[in-house]
Amino acid sequence: MVGPSPAGTVPSHAQSSLPSLPAHLQSDTHLTAHLASRFHVGLPTARLSSQALISLNTYTSSSKGPDGGKEGSAMGEAEDLARRAFTRLGARGENQAIVFLGESGAGKTTLRAHVLSSFLSFSSTPLSSKLSYASFIFDTLTTTKSLTTLTASKAGLFLELQYDGSSSVNPTLIGGKIIDHRLERSRIASVPTGERSFHVLYYLLAGTSAAEKSHLGFDNSIHVSTNAGKLSSASIGHKRWRYLGHPTQLKVGINDAEGFQHFKTALRKLEFPRSEIAEICQILAVILHIGQLDFASGQATLTSAEESGGYSHEGGETVTVVKNKDVLSSVAAFLGLGVDELENSFSYRTKTIHRERVTVMLDPKGARQNADELARTIYSLLVAYILENVNQRICAAEDSVANTVSIVDFPGFSQACSTGSTLDQLLSNAATESLYNFCLQSFFDRKADMLEREEVVVPATSYFDNTDAVRGLLKHGNGLLSILDDQTRRGRTEAQFAESLKKRFENKNPAIVVGSSGSTHGTGYVSQQARSAFTVKHFAGEVDYSISGLLEENGEVISGDLMNLMKSTRSDFVRELFGQEALQTVTHPKEKTAIMQAQVSSKPLRMPSMARRKASPASRLTFDAPTAEEPEDNESYGGSTAKSSGRRKSAMSMTGMQGAAGQFLSSLEIVNKCLSSPSLNPYFIFCLKPNDRRIANQFDSKCVRAQVQTFGIAEISQRLRNADFSVFLPFEEFLGLAEVGNVVVGSDKEKSEVVLDEKRWPGNEARVGSTGVFLSERCWADLAKVGERVVPVYHADGSDEGGDGLLHPRTAGYGDSKVRLLNPADQSLGNFIYGDESKQGYFGSRDIDGRSDTGGSGLNSGDMFHNLETREQMLEKGNEKKMEEVDEVPVSGSRKRWMAIVWLLTFYIPDFAIRLFGRMKRKDVRTAWREKFAINLIIWFSCAVAIFFIVAFPGLVCPTQHVYSAAELESHNGKNGHDSYIAIRGVVFDLDKFMPRHYPDIVPQSSLKKYAGMDATGLFPVQVSALCQGKDGSIDPTVLLDYTPTNISGSATTISTGDLNAKYHDFRYYTNDSRPDWFAEQMKELRATYLKGYIGYTPQYISTLAKKSQNIGSIDGKVYDLTTYISGGRRVAAPTGKEVPANVDREFMDPLVVSLFQDLPGQDLSKHWEQLQIDAGMRDRMQMCLDNLFFVGKVDTRNSAQCQFARYFILAISILICAVVIFKFAAALQFGKKNVPENLDKFIICQVPAYTEDEESLRRAMDSMARMQYDDKRKLLVVICDGMIIGQGNDRPTPRIVLDILGVPESVDPEPLSFESLGEGMKQHNMGKIYSGLYEVQGHIVPFLVVVKVGKPSEVSRPGNRGKRDSQMVLMRFLNRVHYNLPMSPMELEMYHQIRNIIGVNPTFYEFILQVDADTVVAPDSGTRFVASCLADTRIIGICGETGLTNAKHSAVTMIQVYEYFISHNLIKAFESLFGSVTCLPGCFTMYRIRSAETAKPLFVSKEVVEAYSEIRVDTLHMKNLLHLGEDRYLTTLLLKHHPSFKTKFLFAAKAWTIAPESFSVFLSQRRRWINSTVHNLIELIPLQQLCGFCCFSMRFIVFVDLLSTCIQPVSLAYIIYLIVWLARDSSTIPWTSFVLIAAIYGLQALIFIFRRKWEMIGWMIVYLLAMPIFSVALPFYSFWHMDDFSWGNTRVITGEKGRKVVISDEGKFDPASIPKKRWEEYQAELWEAQTSRDDRSEVSGFSYGTKSYHPAQSEYGFPGARPMSQFDLPRYGSRMSLAPSEMMSRHMDMEMEDLSHLPSDDAILAEIREILRTADLMTVTKKSIKQELERRFGVNLDAKRPYINSATEAVLSGAL
């Protein structure tokens, strides 16, 4: 085969074997040209002898050769190779491997499918189809569309076909195994531009029915849409899915919908239950939905008990929230979780930093990364779950497998990192490097060794050897991946990692360069970016890898939060996903149930069958290979056996979990070991791309030549020309095959040489060695007559060759081949994954019928979820908690009475309505809503009553009268800006409005104006007969009634009847122009349009007129004057020319009526009128006459007693309020010099609770406390860190920030000790660490004690965090137990020890405690002033100062608070301080008296206060508002309640500055808390009997007024608006008293800041007044309505059996006995016994309670403070610490020798010594350096172990150990 073919017989391109080309054509260029010539005639393949195949991707069909058949096609060649391998498998019993090499897009996946289908077609078992389905599922889950191909593999595949050895010729397929290596997880959340994520996600989106989409939540318009229209299932391609790349990627020529049906079918064929398939689809939907979650920063305005921190936190800390709650609820439903807990889990992440669990509060970007991590984890676990289940269904028992065929296909070489994951790129390239190295070994080294042993000499061939790169990357122990893993495990930094790489590889390995030299900036300096990178010279080119983020990525840590969250899932499937072996967990060493973190294994779950076998049959050897070193944890590969996985975990306990690189490395080693096995025969398929642009049938010589060079094809071809040996046969076997017998005489070697001479095989294909014969595969086949053997090919339907057989791809396309699932009638089938016209592939035509899918319609066509729970049901199930009864509670009488009132007020609202519309599933939450609603009703009623009293009450008591006295009428004369009014017959009209409309308009307005303010009755004579019907129904028209004005003092100025203008209005009968109804019509019109009121006559004035002989009286409030009538003012007159009729009756009024006015003038005649003996008709007629002729006005009652009462009642209330304001003002004016107190000798504790504040805030607060002008020796700074939490914007946990400020090094790590906390259930057990020392700042040296709440080991999320109240309780409970000499918890005993023995002060000495928030800065003299005031008045139990704002001008929100802060302190608190009862001592700046000065009786820490304040069961609305909203106010309430004889005071001279909320949402939340807690606390105070004062001057009355004013705050603004509107409508009556009161309130406030010279407050006051609507209306109403907005926790009270009230919780039941307690004396005695130490020398008791082990760092002299302890003048503490350092050291050594329980075991030390020596430079390493390194690793002093360390080191070095 070496020689060239005879010229002219066949064209050059017909030669398929490259080694057969002439020697001068063996260069890269010539071989490329030869490949091109074949490519252009439709022959895209070539061979490297029988061992390798070269295939060029045509980007068209891979199954059509030049003549249209498969001959010459890639598929044909693949089938041929498979047939040869299968033959060899049967004939020689060798394991076979087909290894694919090539770049992404070269067609490896397609050819792999052809090879697999060929192998499966050789077997007739039903297993063949199962294996094809399994392969399809693997591809569906792990392939994607990249820039270079539609089917890019993104996971390494080791596909194993298992055969038994019963038949020597045609082995039987008995099983298979899919071993996946390292899925590219990063692609899930980071889809590169122009590429897709994994195909299955697109299948799901496209292939589900409308009903299924609805169930999965795909039909919601929740996703960002690029088109404005509504999203329908048809427009699904236009939705923007974050995890699916650009919307254009949804349509790329892949039939996704069909792919989904095939995916479901494949799962069904592999016996996955329908319900499980539906669950799988739900989980895939979850992944898509997680991508859609939108995060934003918000405030945790829902109050929870765990909140902590200062004023700026009170409105709710900044948290990350999910904006699209509907998407979140879909995710929660499918995962079986509660919506709130899932949302909460995104906003934080728990990490382990320096062996401490820390919760990091995440911003929206961090939450997005957290969500991405969740998506990656779920997808990885789902893939692992599906593949493991597939393997369970296809894998044969290991001991029955005789031989295997392995198909190895790893992703192609990656020059750039497309998904942003350096780790994925590095591991993928490392695998490619390893496989290529194996290829080179197979062709070169492996054969060379054996040829040398057999004394066969062949010419050497030079080739590019990539061993340096392989060794540099993959060497066990000190290869790059091993170092990466080791550095990750040890928690090294990136800089340390870079340094390690430099030490290892610089000038030692040419393939790896650390800190690429090329990246300089012209200055000669290497850039930071270049320094943090390394370059690997791969066989396919150099690649730069960034170190940035690599260590963290390699850890691939799944936080414990996620694991614990998934523990609570209600979904069995999700529980199963997170319970599989693919998920490795790390548990806490002390609490095995607590999962610290987890990791999705980067190792496959299964091992190849060959790797599990201890030895191979010797007789079947081919070429010997250097045996691969057995990896240490070979057996525990992926935790395949329970025993081994357990072993691995125990090994990890010391070193931590193996990283991705370490796992991948060990799995690669196993692959390499299997492939390098002597009993395995490898084949290689080199897949090449003809061009880089995916253009069909175009050959780019440059592109192909580069690939030919990369893979060293020319060198391999040359090597095969020299030595193409594939089989080695010992002489006996060779001769047996050659059937030589005894014909030839001689030795076996001579006989063999004779046979070779006869065969005339070329020398490079057949050679005789010293013990056997080397043959090429062709020669062996010829010899063994393999061609005579028939390899059967089976078809799925049993049809002939022409039919479409199972996995027998005839017309499949490249990149689109392999796939067809349904019958061949559909020409477009198979495009679902590979595009193009393919027709055949994974599945045979008959395999897809419905024979095994009985009732399969639900799966394939309808709704696969119809038998599952709905999303709503799942969500409800996920929100439920597992509860257990933990306690029984009595219900108080007051509670029962209150609930009766609540139900009375809310009975009409049915419970189901609250459940349905309010979405309140829990009964206690619904009850709280009812309470809230009842309280709101009461408040609204109070407001309504207040409004009623202000507005409606005066009107009811004294109805408004529109009457004008004579003087008032006269004042409306149109002069000096007054209106113009005029009166006619007792009715007042608006002359101003009338004048412009006066007819005729010739009369000038000035003439009319002179009548203003006058009675114009005289101008309008009346026709009596038209206005009155008389006694009998008619009056003669000639009868006239004269009008006589009443000119008496007090009556209106009247116009004479002789006025010039009177004649124009005279239309009486006797005039020539008679219009009897004119006056009535005019009056009607005037009343309708211009009426202003009536002339008013007071009862007194009517009496006065009567005395002056006026016949005047009132009936029903109307005043009638009959004087003129009675005095004879009646006459008759007829028109000119007519006579007055005789006997005209001028007496038209009934005598009885007249007599009333004659006999009873000046009186109210209403009763007499009613009693008149006249008929109804007469009464009506007389009433008409009175109204029309004698009416002069109405009775004016404005000065009556009832009206006076109404007026002065409101005034009295106003004056009372004003008096309170004046009192407050007087209280605020506390002038006098600010005397600077003298030095004081009282011991004080300065307490700062820290939560998630930043370093600047903490440093400011602590420094201000330390720098207070108070004797440093007598103050103790106590910082209580509430949980291991990294706040947003912080780079370290808060405790670490605090310790760094105080100067405590990280090496100091005390033991966490138990103590009781405030929490639900088991959360009552908490653990804390105690640190103490000295803090030096600006010349002050202050002792400090830091309490760090770290939580129990089982706490994963927010470990230790229990809230601000709990932080206060830590110190309160400790001091309480100190003063009452009660048993203490371990942590409290440690606190006692640290304070007494380390700091040197007995804890009972401390008399005062100053509580300051972490965002508050105190003035230097404030502490001294507080103590001085408390000494001056020993009855003071609590005292607060004035708090100002440090961020006054930061935002509009802070600006409106400045004045309010000033006034609330200087008015309200100062006023309350007068009574000695400040009702709210703010927690941000208050000093409390710990014990009384005289009797030492505990006050602040008395039993009653501590017990009440440590209430754990906070389950009612009232208790929630007291303890979760306003714990500071409630603490004050408790002090007033339990110590009524003591005072709480305000001291304006003591100053502090805090931070006010800057955003409106936080401000709103903070004020909601304050207002609601105020209401509930004042309700608590009102019943107290002991509040000082008497009657209205009592504090109780003030409390009631305060409560009322809080409730009816909105009314005050409403009243001001009412006054303004009143003024706008009617400025004539100004409510002066109201304005005087308002002016007094604000005027007095202004005086305060004027007297205080706070001139800037004038501006702030204006800002405040503009914000009045917010403070007076918006805040109260918002607060009252949101009174029940809490995070309710999971503990609740329910009605149990027999009506008992029982508490249930999901936190478990707390057993107080789980925390051991001892009195200090007992504890000290135990220490004394243990150490034989004298009691007065108890400093030595540096034993922690938990372990009795000594902590050297905690000794008086050794504790690292912010300055060296030796400079500290100990004696001035008056302490007993006089122990000499030398004695201390010797005692220290003695103690260590006595108790070594905390030291590591000898085995652990030995393991670490081996590890150190394995990587150490033996030329420089010393025993001392080894001991120091061990101490650093274990974190303890190992002096006691020095002899063992020295001996063990020597033993390891000498090989004895």
Curated annotation (Swiss-Prot):
Highest taxon of the lineage: Eukaryota
Q: Where does ATP bind?
A: G102, E103, S104, G105, A106, G107, K108, T109
**Where in the numbering of this chain does the Myosin motor domain appear?**
1-788
Listed A to Z, the keywords are: Actin-binding, ATP-binding, Cell membrane, Glycoprotein, Glycosyltransferase, Membrane, Motor protein, Myosin, Nucleotide-binding, Transferase, Transmembrane, Transmembrane helix
Task: Report the EC number(s), separated by commas if there are several.
Answer: 2.4.1.16
The segment(s) forming the DEK-C domain are: 1799-1854
Q: Name one GO biological process term.
A: fungal-type cell wall organization
Q: Where in the cell is it found?
A: Cell membrane; Cell septum; Cell tip
Q: Which reaction does it catalyse?
A: [(1->4)-N-acetyl-beta-D-glucosaminyl](n) + UDP-N-acetyl-alpha-D-glucosamine = [(1->4)-N-acetyl-beta-D-glucosaminyl](n+1) + UDP + H(+)
Q: Where does the UniProt entry place glycosylation sites? A: N634, N1047, N1072, N1572
Cite the GO molecular-function annotations of the record. actin binding; ATP binding; chitin synthase activity; cytoskeletal motor activity
Q: Which residues cross the membrane?
A: 898-918, 937-957, 1209-1229, 1603-1623, 1630-1650, 1657-1677
The cross-references to InterPro entries, in alphabetical order and at most eight, read:
Chitin_synth (IPR004835), Cyt_B5-like_heme/steroid-bd (IPR001199), Cyt_B5-like_heme/steroid_sf (IPR036400), DEK_C (IPR014876), Kinesin_motor_dom_sf (IPR036961), Myosin_head_motor_dom-like (IPR001609), MYSc_Myo17 (IPR036037), Nucleotide-diphossugar_trans (IPR029044)
Actin-binding: annotated span:
668-692
Q: Write out the GO cellular component annotations.
A: cell septum; cell tip; myosin complex; plasma membrane
Query: Any idea where the Cytochrome b5 heme-binding domain is?
Result: 961-1020
> Membrane topology type, per the record?
Multi-pass membrane protein
- Residue span of region Disordered: 1-22, 601-653
Top enzyme class, one word, equals: transferase
Q: What induces it?
A: Expression is induced in YPAD liquid condition but not in the solid phase condition.
The free-text function statement in the UniProt record for this protein reads:
Polymerizes chitin, a structural polymer of the cell wall and septum, by transferring the sugar moiety of UDP-GlcNAc to the non-reducing end of the growing chitin polymer. Specifically involved in hyphal elongation and new cell wall formation.
Task: Give the family, as the similarity comment puts it.
Answer: In the N-terminal section; belongs to the TRAFAC class myosin-kinesin ATPase superfamily. Myosin family.
Q: What is known of its domains?
A: The N-terminal myosin motor-like domain (MMD) does not seem to have motor activity but is indispensable for polarized cell wall synthesis via binding to actin that ensures the proper localization to the hyphal tips and septation sites near actin structures.
Full protein name:
Chitin synthase Y
Natural source organism: Aspergillus oryzae (strain ATCC 42149 / RIB 40) (Yellow koji mold)
Q: Which lineage do the record's taxonomy fields give for this organism? A: Eukaryota, Fungi, Dikarya, Ascomycota, Pezizomycotina
